[in-house]
């Protein structure tokens, strides 16, 4: 009798995706992050579901319902902190996953890459709305500041902001709709992730060399299932260390104060994973310009396939672009640091220089270095 996993209509799909999938024999641990992101999403959906059972999306009770979860619900504190710090793990994996894609030229799989960029936007939107739900000071003011940015859109801006708010300020209507969106979006993300995988399996995985690996494939199971399990264990070790020993390390103390529209916190800043984009937003003195730069800082990823000038796909054998890549990584760390600093000298000028370098490296220097490397290797006639 033929193996059921190869004949059953449903098991057959799973088999071709996770068991008998032909994978390159040389993919490194940088290829673990796709599966880690899947696990992160599952953890977030499960913990989120249990939190939603006890949470109330009303301005009067939201803050105290989160307190109730932490104090009175069995292991509520664990679920809450796993969800909050799970978001941080999600973004760490996301940034490493995108960074891997940039380094090894995975963006040449256009469909997979574009769905990935869409996923990044969806996850960022979900995380932003989730941060509003506990209705602390930073929740309220973060929501006010970020939604207010839409008022920079000419002509329709103000109307659009009031439409999103459901009134003339961030209030009960805003919180209720943010909860609804925060609940539904992860399921949309899960659906998009399946499409992401679908497109990936049309072409097969990339590998560190960027060369065609059809001549040397191995089955996904057991080789990469075991490798992924190791990655998952390491990730859970990091997550649970964070949750059980340093649950508030990545949070903001201001969010332990209930939202008060009459009192502005001294420094309004988002969660750490948005700080690089926030720094770019703040470094431009013009409101609309800042908003455009903010959106472009992520949307620039969609341009990567068109900015690829080299005859080689990966950066493995391209030392000049490698140097630029690591400068870009350092630059993003500087932007993340600046995003959390007050708007005063010398942070303003550092932020502006880092923002200029961010766009310059991606749009100008990397394409030029690709051409230079090809010339040096005499890949052009």
From Swiss-Prot:
Miscellaneous comment in the UniProt entry for this protein: Heme 1 (or BL or b562) is low-potential and absorbs at about 562 nm, and heme 2 (or BH or b566) is high-potential and absorbs at about 566 nm.
Organism: Mus macedonicus (Macedonian mouse)
Any one GO MF annotation of this record: metal ion binding
Principal location class: mitochondrion
Cofactor note text: Binds 2 heme b groups non-covalently.
Cofactor: heme b
Protein name in UniProt: Cytochrome b
Gene3D superfamilies, A to Z: Cytochrome Bc1 Complex, Chain C
């Amino acid at each position: 009798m033929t193996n059921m996993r190869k004949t059953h209509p449903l098991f057959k799909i799973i088999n071709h995706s996770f068991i008998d999938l032909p994978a390159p024999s040389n993919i490194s641990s940088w290829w673990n992050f796709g599966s880690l992101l899947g696990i992160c999403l599952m953890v977030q959906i499960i913990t989120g579901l249990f939190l939603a059972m006890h949470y109330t999306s009303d301005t009067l009770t939201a803050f105290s319902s989160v307190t109730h979860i932490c104090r009175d619900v069995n292991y509520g504190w664990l679920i809450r902190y796993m969800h909050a710090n799970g978001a941080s793990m999600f973004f760490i994996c996301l940034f490493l996953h995108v960074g891997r894609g940039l380094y090894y030229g995975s963006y040449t799989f256009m469909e997979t890459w574009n769905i990935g960029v869409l996923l990044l936007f969806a996850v960022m939107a979900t995380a932003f709305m989730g941060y509003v739900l506990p209705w602390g000071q930073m929740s309220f003011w973060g929501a006010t500041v970020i939604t207010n940015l839409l008022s920079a859109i000419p002509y329709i801006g103000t109307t659009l902001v009031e439409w999103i708010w459901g009134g003339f300020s961030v209030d009960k209507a805003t919180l209720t709709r943010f909860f609804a969106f925060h609940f539904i979006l992860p399921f949309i993300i899960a659906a998009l992730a399946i499409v992401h995988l679908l497109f990936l399996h049309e072409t097969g995985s990339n590998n560190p060399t960027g060369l065609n690996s059809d001549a040397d494939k191995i089955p996904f199971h057991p080789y990469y299932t075991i490798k992924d399990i190791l990655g998952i264990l390491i990730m859970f070790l990091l997550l649970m260390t964070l949750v059980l020993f340093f649950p508030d390390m990545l949070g903001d103390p201001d969010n332990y104060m209930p939202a008060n529209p009459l009192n502005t916190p001294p420094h309004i800043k988002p969660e750490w994973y948005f700080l690089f984009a926030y720094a770019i937003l703040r470094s431009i003195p013009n409101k609309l310009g800042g908003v455009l730069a903010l959106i472009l800082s992520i949307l620039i990823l969609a341009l990567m396939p068109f900015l690829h000038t080299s005859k080689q796909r990966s950066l493995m054998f391209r030392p000049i672009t490698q140097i630029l890549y690591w400068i870009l990584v350092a630059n993003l760390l500087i932007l993340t640091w600046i995003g959390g600093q007050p708007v005063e000298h010398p942070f303003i000028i550092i932020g502006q220089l880092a923002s200029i370098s961010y766009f310059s490296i991606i749009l100008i220097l990397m394409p030029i270095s690709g051409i230079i490397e090809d010339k040096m290797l005499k890949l052009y006639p």
